[in-house]
Amino acid sequence: FVENYLPLVENGFDLVSANKIANTIGYPFYKKLRETLAQYKKQYLYETNVGAGLPLIDTIKLLHHSGENITRIKGIFSGTLSFLFNTYSASDAPFSEILQKAINSGYTEPDPREDLCGNDVGRKLLILARELDLENEFEEVTIENLIPEALRQGSREEFLSRLKEFDPIYQQIKDNAPAGTVLRYVGDLHGDLSQTATARLDVKLVSVPVTSALGQVKGADSIFEIYTESYGENPIVIQGAGAGAAV
């Protein structure tokens, strides 16, 4: 449907969308859309692209357009994966059991591999990078796929019947985590963010101190830390519900 965005704007329509496609496909389209919006004095509202109902994108826009130098954005972008690893880190239950609970609770996509592959988090991170006028493409995002190689192909039904194959892999990761840490699946926009070539976009499973802001997250909450030149090592933190029917 995004191919209709330009003619819609040209014919006098504002745009409102929860869909991420227009903000994550090739940068030439992204740039052309914004030039067209400016030319026709129209708005494109997409706050829910990242962070569900949290006021994240608007906050980043306001900071950036005010001249504040944003130096890093780090956070838990997926409410689904937040629930998985928050629960897993605090429980003795096997990973497959917690994943099944997430499926039953409606936290995941119909095929949970859409959440577990990490691409959705990668797209969200890319959207934030582009808000800082970086011209990165999706292919430049480094994404850790959480799905064991043997389970990435095949039908949804076959995948759901083999969830126990996750257990030894994630038990080993959990056992190897340093004491006093918990597992979190984190998106991290860092490096020199003043230019596209030096910006780094990483999405991966990491161990964080249990006492940190990311380590304290509960349930299916999302959390975002926005580091700026003015605030130094004390980031602006935005946190709230990241998954579930209500959001």
Feature roles, as predicted:
Residues 1-5, 95-98, 223-226:
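Structured alpha-helical segments in the cores of large, soluble enzyme domains
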Residues 2-11, 20-47, 52-63:
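Rossmann-fold NAD(P)-binding glycine/threonine-rich loop
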Residues 12-14, 79:
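Glycine-enriched alpha-helix->loop->beta-strand junction motifs that scaffold or abut catalytic
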Residues 15-18, 44-48, 72-75, 238:
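General beta-strand structural signal in soluble alpha/beta enzymes
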Residues 28, 51, 55, 90-97, ...:
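Conserved active-site and cofactor/substrate-binding residues in soluble primary-metabolism enzymes
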Residues 59-123, 128:
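Conserved anion/nucleotide-ligand pocket segment
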Residues 72-74, 82-85, 89, 192, ...:
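Catalytic, metal-anchored helix/loop core of enzyme active sites in primary metabolism
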Residues 97-216:
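Substrate-binding/catalytic subdomain of NAD(P)-dependent oxidoreductase enzymes
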